[in-house]
């Protein structure tokens, strides 16, 4: 190769070039072809067709024009991608079986439900439909931005100022690179009602929107079976909706019946459906049909299926549902472009995006109209000044040699305005008066004066001028009010939506059938105790509790799970397959899930990422999981207590979290440098114990905190922390009625004796040597709780909860454990029972279970004993308790009776 050409060559890595080029191609397909914009619900080709028809005057009130002319205009001005793609898009916009509200009014053959192709574009004619005008209304008032077209000769709108949520009303479908969208059509009236509800309350729950948006409304009618698919689609943006055609059974004499299909599912080819039924009859997969014919006409669908004598029609119909597309699924993927990027959105997010867009449109329109009104008022003020000084105006004009000199002389002169000063103030004109209360004409005003007709000098015209100025003043005041008041702007938005509804809303075509289609599958789930493990990397799994064997204290443990990429266990708890769980995330959101929906694994398995199970946002991860009682009747008297690392706490009603949609809800507001440590159910007569990693603890009554209804509150100060210290655990304890003196006296009784008293063993009051009576000792023994404290270096101890005195929240607390370099920092604090077992997990994935009865009971201010032999650089990261309910022994089978969990984040 000569130097002439080699000097222009730039060597590149072919792998990098292919990646970059393919990414460019993918984004081009996503943004410029296949995915609709959430604001107007249109892809670029549809937007260009409608705008081109609008610009060409091909309106609903005008005569039809040849489709070929429309396609040519679109291709020549905006869309240089071939006429067939443009015409196919135009054809679909005319089909009343494809769009709920067709955007193009067609005349001629535009295809059919049988899959027939439309006639050539030279034969068909089109014009905008009436509802399409609502997509372009106010487009000439500065409402949306315009872009240069492909050759720089024209401008086209980046989006249409749609007055109704077209994305939901007409739906959309498309396949891009690596993604697809499939949004069903809806009823206009229902969608606008949902928009109005959102305008009235931006915090409305999606389930409340479902009260008005019953589900998709397909242009072909048919039925939707069940609401589970609808709920999933609206809550998460993805779902599968079961569609079923409508059929009637008629008696035709001689003990014979016929099935009449009158509606078919959306996007099902009717001719292929009939062929499929015939094929199934031929293969004898459907039996009992003697005749089949398509009797459909312009009045609607009618597929006649004649049955043999004495055949049960319901059985045949069910066979047709099972074997053909008379019953099929619509896979919903509510993917659309938001801020130029593809995003899967739920129902509320789509509505919110549309409402936000309409706010911008109305604001831009108001600014445009305000400027126009002010410009007009400015000219009228000039005319008013001229009429007030008409003699001098005429003299100047007559004395000038030409128009330019007259205009300049008018602009140079200072004019009295005292007579019209009220009009100037009325229209809020920004003129600059000099010290003597005079002003000069602007060039615009001077030009208008020179063009003024003599008839404007009459008294009637003067009065009309004043009335025009007053009218403009009213308009200007209204425009300023709209710009200053979001409330007024939303009122206008809502009024315009309601007008569209009144003009174009039609009855629902698609019925929704409830019943066995939404049958709960939980009855089929076998009850089994599971160990749920969550890793810091966001992986979760459930393992049958029987997979773990019991070991004695001091053992080396077994491999609990395979740790990859230095992932460590964050949380472990035990529950039934039917246990409901609340998942709390680092950004303060809460999600709800039943335990059986978690991935089943083995002790060495890693599980699945929670982002594949819950609809987590970018940079969002689960920090806490709270198992709840299976019986929701028990929730009525429970509260939820939140605790954060910075020592904040909040008490809320558990019932506030009873109805949580699939995409979650806000649970608590967190500061940027704070994180959620624990969330637990509690009762009013119970106590809260906060513990820190530095070995401090603080106990206070639940009733000392008021219930906070706001889910966006960050709560109140629970504990004052030292520098570098943080809360690592929150424990719920029983309330106590005894005095501190009585508790101190009780604690002088040896713990072995206290345990025996609690088990019912008789005791000698005098031998105990305390001033308490027998009833008090017995009551305190039966109510005594023990607090387990575990450190990162494997040390642990049990202490009586009576040793933690009750104080006011907000204090610094008392010593919980004597920590040092040998013990390390505290990682877990929780109440335990005598027959509990301890489960510890280290950052290397090692797991051990040991009997708590072998863990020494000591006072608060002690360091405890070694619970777990650790290797170098090994730390305890998770502590859980499992209560034994079956026979004891080293390899006993264990089930859950109570559970607490703590983690080191």
UniProtKB/Swiss-Prot annotation:
GO biological process: DNA topological change; DNA-templated DNA replication
Domain Topo IIA-type catalytic: 35-524
Domain of life: Bacteria
Alphabetical list of PROSITE patterns matching this protein: TOPO_IIA
Motif GyrA-box positions after renumbering to this chain: 551-557
One Pfam family hit: DNA_gyraseA_C
Chain segments annotated as transmembrane: none
Major localization listed first in the record, in broad terms: cytoplasm
Any one GO molecular function term: DNA negative supercoiling activity
EC number: 5.6.2.2
Compartments, record wording: Cytoplasm
Disulfide bonds: none
Subunit annotation: Heterotetramer, composed of two GyrA and two GyrB chains. In the heterotetramer, GyrA contains the active site tyrosine that forms a transient covalent intermediate with DNA, while GyrB binds cofactors and catalyzes ATP hydrolysis.
HAMAP family referenced in this protein's UniProt entry, alphabetically: GyrA
Note in the entry: Few gyrases are as efficient as E.coli at forming negative supercoils. Not all organisms have 2 type II topoisomerases; in organisms with a single type II topoisomerase this enzyme also has to decatenate newly replicated chromosomes.
Known function: A type II topoisomerase that negatively supercoils closed circular double-stranded (ds) DNA in an ATP-dependent manner to modulate DNA topology and maintain chromosomes in an underwound state. Negative supercoiling favors strand separation, and DNA replication, transcription, recombination and repair, all of which involve strand separation. Also able to catalyze the interconversion of other topological isomers of dsDNA rings, including catenanes and knotted rings. Type II topoisomerases break and join 2 DNA strands simultaneously in an ATP-dependent manner.
Name assigned to this protein: DNA gyrase subunit A
Lineage: Bacteria, Pseudomonadati, Pseudomonadota, Alphaproteobacteria, Rickettsiales
